[in-house]
Amino acid sequence: MIKVAVLGYGNIGSGVVQVLLKNKETIAKKAGDEIVPACVLDLRDFPGDVMEDKVVKDINLITQNPEISIVIETMGGTKPAYAFVKACLEAGKHVATSNKELVAAHGPELLEIAKAHHVSFLFEASVGGGIPIIRPLVSSITSDAVTEITGILNGTTNYMLTKMSEDGLDYDAVLEDAQERGYAERNPAADVEGHDARRKIAILSSLAFGKYVDYEDVYTEGITKITSADFAYAKVLGSRIKLFGTSKKKEDGSISAMVCPVMITNEHPLFAVNDVMNAILVRGESMGDLMFYGAGAGKLPTASAVVADVVNAARNPKITEIAPYEPGKMTVSDHLKSTHSYFVRVKGSDANAVAESFKAKQIVDAGIADEFGLITAEWTENEFDALCENYPVVSVIRLAK
């Protein structure tokens, strides 16, 4: 019998216990032994819950319990999660987490601590919810050099952009709808301002390129400035607007990395990824394109990914899975030097003159009074920003390459 402890008994933590109990026979066959939730750490009590009598409030009762070999962290945030996970690893316990904030901020350090104590620090559920992407990057895609990772990494914003596109709703209305459905938090900033996607693309980039990418180095724009008028133009163009997290390897060994809304055509592999679904596109020099698609969030999909890490640790307790990070921090290039084509909306009616300045490939009319849209030539961000200062620009959306 393998005993596990769960840190944090909220949505994901209770989902983990639910999966462990509901699928205990299947899990036992795959793990080679029965896996039992021995206790949960939480300041709250849970009368009537299946774990009612197994709630502890002191982390030392877990770190000092020799019968507990695997710890599952689902608390979220970095305080006190970081201190608790560090203590568990130092106590010789494998740790599986769904906490993207923890992994993005402290991943390299926790991996080194795990390595020093001959245990594993596993975080499959920290990026794609139920999408298996971490292990393929670490274990499966090892014979090829990854050149790019692009993903729709946040279900909340993808749902909102889908509703804006399909129903013609404006931002405020679709945010309220997402909150009523439980897709968006009461304070939605982490999702709608792109911070969630930024942490996820930083984690994926670190694994894909083998060196720690600091999420704070990733230039980020959210979806708060996207309007129904932008979608009117997108419809004319046969395009959709998505929030992408993208990183690309450069010839000098650095990477470019960005989170921002992009306009994509139906030729793009992520065009049909709608509603709360997520997808991650991995490009390699030899393998071409690989796509990972599924539920990027949610109680049971995320819990299932956490339990998969637990099963792996249980099945191979003496094999420590360590992501191959090189020492130091990856250099992320200045986003102002990156090159894009842009969709730009401009006030006025003199489209031809403005189009000439932007070297526009196309003038777009969406039937909106006193403005027009352009598809520009490629410009660096610096060059484009300087051009925009000369005109009454309403909005700008980059075109996905």
What residues fall within each predicted segment?
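Structural motif
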Residues: 7, 73-75, 98, 105, ...
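A short hydrophobic/small-residue beta-strand
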Residues: 94-96
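N-terminal glycine-/serine-/threonine-rich beta1-alpha1-beta2 phosphate-ribose binding loop
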Residues: 1-91
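Catalytic, metal-anchored helix/loop core of enzyme active sites in primary metabolism
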Residues: 146-150, 158-161, 165, 177, ...
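Rossmann-fold NAD(P)-binding glycine/threonine-rich loop
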Residues: 81-87, 91, 100-138
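Rossmann-like NAD(P)H-binding beta-loop-alpha module
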Residues: 68, 115-196, 203
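Substrate-binding/catalytic subdomain of NAD(P)-dependent oxidoreductase enzymes
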Residues: 175-272, 277-279
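A conserved regulatory-domain signal marking ACT and ACT-like small-molecule sensing domains
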Residues: 310-401
